[in-house]
Amino acid sequence: MKKNQFLKESDVTAESVFFMKRRQVLKALGISAAALSLPHAAHADLLSWFKGNDRPPAPAGKPLEFSKPAAWQNNLPLTPADKVSGYNNFYEFGLDKADPAANAGSLKTDPWTLKISGEVAKPLTLDHDDLTRRFPLEERIYRMRCVEAWSMVVPWIGFPLHKLLALAEPTSNAKYVAFETIYAPEQMPGQQDRFIGGGLKYPYVEGLRLDEAMHPLTLMTVGVYGKALPPQNGAPVRLIVPWKYGFKGIKSIVSIKLTRERPPTTWNLAAPDEYGFYANVNPHVDHPRWSQATERFIGSGGILDVQRQPTLLFNGYADQVASLYRGLDLRENF
């Protein structure tokens, strides 16, 4: 796999930024919702806590054994770990970016069962230990682009999805891959209460075309920064598809089903005019309510300090994945 020439050393986000509790800090500072209407400079000053030294420590995950293939390394400085695991979207635990870190400790990730079924010759069931032992793990430094026009760069640890699917032996009828998050309302407050969970229909579901799922970039992710994923980042296993918007990266997966027909996806069901099935990062196709031409890269400074940077087509992975969409109108199929 060719190194991604679009990544610069300044693009990768550092370990000290990953596990923040934003809501608690804002309350401690007495910052009200009205304060968030202040001009940009005031935002940067008020939210300078984002680069402070009094952040809670990152949760201690289990250390993982993994390789570091040169093609995925780039020797780049990393997005701080406390920001990557402290600034999250995981609506099952609340709508605020700090809610997942504050609330996801209730999720029991061991024991765990992941089933692979549908249009396969050999259905599989993996347990918690299989996720980290059955396949060789490798660290990959990937860009991550949220549909909300912010981005990070993260050293994920996992294995290519195509290796798992190959074991199940997809049949000739398989055209799509459907994913499903665990449904556990007793552990996930957003699944109990529509107000907490943003009014989405749960369990969260996602999908890919089979060729997208089989692409070498598509990663079943079990760790970050050398350790097992924390719950707020989708433990024990989540999907990373680096050329797509982050909401395609379904978390805490319990089911993978190969299908003949295109599967439903949560955000497309909720707002089909705003969130397409493909969700490829594209600076030329705006969200109906904001531009996608630029993005706010979250690094080691204050969250509103940083300069906006141009959004790259396919999040900088065009050389690797553009051929998947040859002849497809990316504006219509957003």
From Swiss-Prot:
<dbReference type="InterPro" id="IPR022867">
    <property type="entry name" value="MsrP"/>
</dbReference>
<keyword id="KW-0479">Metal-binding</keyword>
<feature type="signal peptide" description="Tat-type signal">
    <location>
        <begin position="1"/>
        <end position="44"/>
    </location>
</feature>
<feature type="binding site">
    <location>
        <begin position="91"/>
        <end position="92"/>
    </location>
    <ligand>
        <name>Mo-molybdopterin</name>
    </ligand>
</feature>
<comment type="function">
    <text>Part of the MsrPQ system that repairs oxidized periplasmic proteins containing methionine sulfoxide residues (Met-O), using respiratory chain electrons. Thus protects these proteins from oxidative-stress damage caused by reactive species of oxygen and chlorine generated by the host defense mechanisms. MsrPQ is essential for the maintenance of envelope integrity under bleach stress, rescuing a wide series of structurally unrelated periplasmic proteins from methionine oxidation, including the primary periplasmic chaperone SurA and the lipoprotein Pal.</text>
</comment>
<feature type="binding site">
    <location>
        <position position="146"/>
    </location>
    <ligand>
        <name>Mo-molybdopterin</name>
    </ligand>
</feature>
<protein>
    <recommendedName>
        <fullName>Protein-methionine-sulfoxide reductase catalytic subunit MsrP</fullName>
        <ecNumber>1.8.5.-</ecNumber>
    </recommendedName>
</protein>
<dbReference type="InterPro" id="IPR000572">
    <property type="entry name" value="OxRdtase_Mopterin-bd_dom"/>
</dbReference>
<keyword id="KW-0732">Signal</keyword>
<dbReference type="InterPro" id="IPR036374">
    <property type="entry name" value="OxRdtase_Mopterin-bd_sf"/>
</dbReference>
<dbReference type="GO" id="GO:0043546">
    <property type="term" value="F:molybdopterin cofactor binding"/>
</dbReference>
<keyword id="KW-0560">Oxidoreductase</keyword>
<feature type="binding site">
    <location>
        <begin position="249"/>
        <end position="251"/>
    </location>
    <ligand>
        <name>Mo-molybdopterin</name>
    </ligand>
</feature>
<feature type="binding site">
    <location>
        <position position="88"/>
    </location>
    <ligand>
        <name>Mo-molybdopterin</name>
    </ligand>
</feature>
<dbReference type="GO" id="GO:0016672">
    <property type="term" value="F:oxidoreductase activity, acting on a sulfur group of donors, quinone or similar compound as acceptor"/>
</dbReference>
<dbReference type="GO" id="GO:0046872">
    <property type="term" value="F:metal ion binding"/>
</dbReference>
<feature type="binding site">
    <location>
        <position position="181"/>
    </location>
    <ligand>
        <name>Mo-molybdopterin</name>
    </ligand>
</feature>
<dbReference type="GO" id="GO:0030091">
    <property type="term" value="P:protein repair"/>
</dbReference>
<comment type="similarity">
    <text>Belongs to the MsrP family.</text>
</comment>
<feature type="binding site">
    <location>
        <position position="233"/>
    </location>
    <ligand>
        <name>Mo-molybdopterin</name>
    </ligand>
</feature>
<dbReference type="Pfam" id="PF00174">
    <property type="entry name" value="Oxidored_molyb"/>
</dbReference>
<comment type="subunit">
    <text>Heterodimer of a catalytic subunit (MsrP) and a heme-binding subunit (MsrQ).</text>
</comment>
<dbReference type="GO" id="GO:0042597">
    <property type="term" value="C:periplasmic space"/>
</dbReference>
<dbReference type="InterPro" id="IPR006311">
    <property type="entry name" value="TAT_signal"/>
</dbReference>
<keyword id="KW-0500">Molybdenum</keyword>
<keyword id="KW-0574">Periplasm</keyword>
<feature type="binding site">
    <location>
        <position position="238"/>
    </location>
    <ligand>
        <name>Mo-molybdopterin</name>
    </ligand>
</feature>
